[in-house]
Amino acid sequence: MAEITAALVKELRERTGEGMMDCKKALTKAGGDIEKAIDDMRASGAIKAAKKAGNVAAEGAIALKEDGKSAVLLEVNSQTDFLALQDDFKAFVAASVEKAFADKLTDAAPLIEAQEADRLVLVGKVGENVNIRRLVRVEGDVVGGYLHGNKIGVAVVLKGGNVELAKDIAMHVAASNPEFLLPSEVSADAIEREKAVFLSLNADKIAGKPENIVENMIKGRISKFLAEASLVEQAFVKNPEIKVGELAKKAGAEIVSFTYFKVGEGIEKPVDNFAEEVAAQLAAAKQ
């Protein structure tokens, strides 16, 4: 019998929309054969919500739980923004982040398993696909977080300073979404890509200019890029006269890390074509 790995269970869950435990049982019964497991689940009527499970859940909410020394950021997805505003969904999100924080979870997998029964009840009640997508736990000397509505969440870890400062920096991150903490973290590839973009966009301005002038123009653009992309080099949103790194230093603090979550980030949303959908339905009706 093939080994029932977590990856195999995850694949079956993604293909059927069923719970992790149900998928594990089906795979065990099928001897690790995923196609047989799917056939068995279909034959037994276990895949009742296949249509819902196939729907992309790219809306939802970000939840944050913190205590000054640690924080949990959690993303739970729904199919529509409307559901994300409903009490049943909010209650599920709140219960999930509370459990993740209390159990000191550092990964979404155990939370998904623990909340699966409640998730299925919610899906059955609201008629939409709902998924716990990702979870991050951070710990440190000083930890502060910020939620922008329920769509963006940030957790900042400091060495020194205080929670209020961490929260202020987290708010800045939510507004500015830096890619890196320090300029030194920016990869050579990222710098080369920025250089290529600059040269492409400014081909007319550069044409005919001496090489040393072009090099200075490139250096200026790269310096600006590093400042825009690095948290410590960005102008603080509440006081643009000071950089975020300087703000922390004046408070006797060092920014250790930041974590940024935005609802649906990286999820490819389907683009519905109403005309094609109607045409397909009419064609099916004629058959």
UniProtKB/Swiss-Prot annotation:
GO terms for cellular component: cytoplasm. It is found in: Cytoplasm. Residues 80-83 are annotated as: Involved in Mg(2+) ion dislocation from EF-Tu. PROSITE patterns: EF_TS_1 (PS01126), EF_TS_2 (PS01127). InterPro entries: EF-Ts_dimer_sf, Transl_elong_EFTs/EF1B, Transl_elong_EFTs/EF1B_dimer, Transl_elong_Ts_CS, UBA-like_sf. Keywords: Cytoplasm, Elongation factor, Protein biosynthesis. The keyword Cytoplasm applies. One of its GO terms (molecular function) is translation elongation factor activity. The keyword Manganese does not apply. Pfam families: EF_TS. Associates with the EF-Tu.GDP complex and induces the exchange of GDP to GTP. It remains bound to the aminoacyl-tRNA.EF-Tu.GTP complex up to the GTP hydrolysis stage on the ribosome. Belongs to the EF-Ts family. This is Elongation factor Ts. It comes from Pseudomonas fluorescens (strain SBW25).
